[in-house]
A protein has these predicted regions:
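N-terminal strand-loop-strand
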Residues: 18-64, 69-70, 91-92, 96, ...
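Nudix hydrolase/Nudix homology domain
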Residues: 1, 10, 58-63, 125-170
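The −1 position to Zn-ligating cysteines in a subset of zinc-ribbon hairpins
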Residues: 1, 16-19
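Surface-exposed, charge/polar-rich loops and edge strands
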Residues: 74-75
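Hydrophobic alpha-helical positions that pack around
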Residues: 66, 80, 84
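Active-site-adjacent beta-strand/loop module that shapes the phosphate/pyrophosphate-binding cleft
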Residues: 101-126
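Cys/His-rich microdomains that often coordinate metals
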Residues: 1, 6-9, 24-31
Length: 170
């Protein structure tokens, strides 16, 4: 329903928007709200990658990089630092932009970063992040081959970030 007049809405612009059906209100075009989110590949001084398992993931083998929504009044780099601290207790130094990916559900835009850890002692929150660990390229490859870890899906920016660190496609 139209948030201005309450009339029904119909898909518009090939599904990227909605159009109000109220002609008296000008059949206004409505665009979805986009929720900004950050996703961060965190590396330490030994070029190990921090991977974590989220409590919401059904596959216990799935590990990915840090991610979370940007809060009101927060810049993207601060969101990366806050999420890393909240989820793993890791303090970040330099944070560098890598790219972005639309994430349709829940209407999010994922902005990807690579960050360098200042601290390496992992302390997961136990609520959102259940486990987290540092891995070398050889350790990660061995975990994947043994089936003890699973990588994020092929169409995700998380997988691209891991492959960029790994130096090859999975």
């Amino acid at each position: 329903f139209c948030p201005t007049c309450g009339a029904a809405v119909r898909p518009a612009l090939a599904g990227w928007a909605q159009r109000c059906t109220n002609e008296a209100d000008g059949n206004r075009v409505l665009f979805p709200r986009v929720e900004p989110a950050v996703i961060t590949a965190i590396v330490d001084g030994h070029d190990r990658l921090l991977l974590q398992h989220n409590a919401a993931w059904k596959d216990s083998r799935l590990y990915s990089v840090s991610a979370g929504f940007v809060e009101a009044g927060e810049n993207l780099e601060h969101a990366c630092r806050r999420e890393a601290m909240e989820e793993t207790g890791i303090k970040l130094g330099e944070v560098r932009y890598l790219g972005s990916q639309p994430w349709p559900f829940p209407a999010s835009l994922m902005m990807a970063f690579k960050a360098h850890a200042i601290t390496t002692d992992v302390r997961v929150d136990g609520e959102e992040t259940m486990t987290a660990r540092w891995v070398t390229r050889d350790e990660y490859t061995a975990e994947l081959i043994a089936g003890r870890m699973a990588a994020p899906g092929r169409a995700t920016i998380a997988r691209y970030m891991i492959e960029e660190w790994l130096g090859r496609e999975l």
